[in-house]
Regions:
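Selective transmembrane helix interface/packing segments
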Residues: 1-177
């Protein structure tokens, strides 16, 4: 019901916004999510794309998220959106390093950067039990990257409501969520 309500809301573009880039930012946000799912092996037979460097591809596409945030904050021509973008990017970049380091453990254990190869290498025992510290670090870094509690400062309702996407509404706002 909430999704339907969001899709039917009026889509407003701010007066001083760079309209092309303002409209491009939600598309970049949605495209990065779809591109990340392309290399995830669901079953041995259902793989979008089995690239040999799946982990590197996954992290590179995830890093594009900082670009979409900066574009969204800057293109709306709102100083609060820009400040929210700066704050969000600072948080995302600070947790990027632990996320990459925790992903290196399964890569080293499996001897491959292919997500399919890493999945197959865990046939006997999951790496969660072999490297619990790396698994916990990956979990915490992912909480921070996705903005879940206790790292939900990205929208900081007590400071700047909605952060970088303060000017977005309707369908465009939904593409960020």
């Amino acid at each position: 019901a909430d999704a339907l309500k969001m899709l039917t809301k009026e889509d407003i573009t701010p007066t001083g916004a760079d309209k092309f880039i303002y409209n491009l930012a939600p598309v970049i946000a949605f495209a990065t999510v779809i591109l990340m799912w392309a290399v995830v092996p669901f079953t041995p037979l259902h793989i979008g794309a089995d690239v040999g460097i799946g982990v590197l591809y996954f992290m590179a596409v995830a890093s594009i998220g900082t670009v979409k945030i900066m574009v969204a904050g800057w293109s709306s021509n709102n100083k609060y959106a820009l400040l929210g973008a700066f704050r969000t990017i600072a948080q995302l970049l600070s947790y990027e390093v632990p996320l990459v380091l925790s992903l290196l453990i399964p890569v080293m254990l499996a001897g491959t950067m292919s997500l399919q190869g890493i999945t197959e290498a865990q046939g006997g025992m999951w790496y969660l039990f072999i490297a619990p510290v790396a698994a916990f670090l990956f979990y915490v870094a992912n909480l921070a990257e996705t903005g879940r509690a206790p790292f939900d400062l990205l929208e900081a309702e007590s400071e700047i409501i909605a952060g970088y996407n303060i000017e977005y509404s309707g369908f465009k706002w939904g593409m960020f969520m």
